[in-house]
Amino acid sequence: VRQQLEEIPMTVRPDPTFHATAKLAMQAPPETLAFTLMLSPDGSQPDGLAVIDVDPKSSKYGQIVHQVIMPNKGDEFHHFGWNACSSALSPLTGHAFLERRYLIIPGIRSSRIYVVDVKEPLKAKIHKIIEPEEVFAKTGYSRPHTIHCGPEGIYVSTLGGGGADGTDGPPGIFIMDCETFDIIGRYEIDRGPQNKQYDFWWNLPRDYMVSSEWGLPPQFENGLVPEDLLSNKYGHRLHFWNLRERKNVQTIDLGANHQMALEVRPAHDPVKEYGFCGVVVDTTNLEGSIWTWWREDGKFHAKKTATIPPEGAKKDDLPPMLQGFEAVPPLVTDIDLSLDDRHLYVACWGTGEMRQYDVSDPMNPKLSGSVHVGGIVRKTKHPSGKDFGYGPQMVEISRDGKRVYWTNSLYSTWDDQFYPGDRGAAMVKADVGENGGLTLDEKFFVDFPKGYRSHQIRLEGGDCSTDSFCYPNV
């Protein structure tokens, strides 16, 4: 046996797409494929995963080159993530030899979870399906949302608690085994005042996590509830956790008028103790806003560091929900931070604008680039001449920071409220200038199959909202 063991070539190495630092990840080869979720807004056909050619040298650039269509209807695909990423290189992990091979795709409406094997992207296939009953039984949660690959497992946030309408107990986070994909159990030991959930991320070496709030299922599943918005009943708090103790150590209220504190984006270099959060709308003036949060002397703080004003509009140009305001709110629905922690991208889904901020000074974001496409009133066409329905929504950045991709659907029922009628799915790309600035690529416009909308994007080999880095940049 010993002789047999000695003859086995020792070639086990960490996945080459795992990087110790964000700086090293930026030097990796550029992506040639993207993975984008397709959802059927009325549930008339199954949702799917599109594999898209993003190699400018390819004859199929900007085209869907493979699809994985699910066996069920009514899932509503939304966010998704990898089984493993650079967090596997943490000195605390026992999983250094995992590979970035599987995409974990939850159905936000069905609470079903799919595991898709993309080792051969053009032959991607379903590996495992976790039925909603297992999610409910093992966690007491429903409506799984955000996926993050942690050092000891896959973390999944949820938007619903138990019961048919998801309001029996607060939502939270649960952990899945990153090899078997079994659900292990709830994350929280002490949740403190947290009773809503949306996004979450962390600083692994500093051992803390931050989470945000959207609303409970009755507040979003059938559309935005205007009465709840105007009475400030959506989420407006950030929660800070001791990651290992699984304990809420501090909650910051951004103010009840700052409705829907959504995406949280910590700095990628773990030496830096700050990050950003986007707030959809201020109910006193319809502004969108960016908040910077940071830790100092053991305490967390948050401050509004950028605002985006609404745009005036004629009543007849607006959907019924906005006619009384005679204005279009920017509706900040997604943000993303480049790996060098320099550029923050802000999707203004209402006004049809993608903004780029220079956040080299995180307390003083400076607008450094902007492009318009779509929008409730503007309806700006893409440079290709095609209509871009809805507005810029889920945004993803290449590892080297030179390319920015985005899609246009927010959430099926909200799409229909703010943009009545079906506007079609789209995915576009902008190139980033050497000193900032954005230019839409007129050759890149992905058409999706009829009847589908498009939501989150993941890039081959990792991107800027996936990987957690455990070592400082050098």
Give residue spans per PLM region.
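Short loop/turn segments immediately following beta-strands, especially the blade-tip
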Residues: V51-K60, V115-K125, C178-F181, F240-R246, ...
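Asp-box/WD-like beta-propeller blade repeats and closely related beta-sheet repeat scaffolds
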Residues: D117-L204
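Beta-propeller domains
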Residues: T11-P14, A25-L98, I104-E131, G166-D168, D190-P362, ...
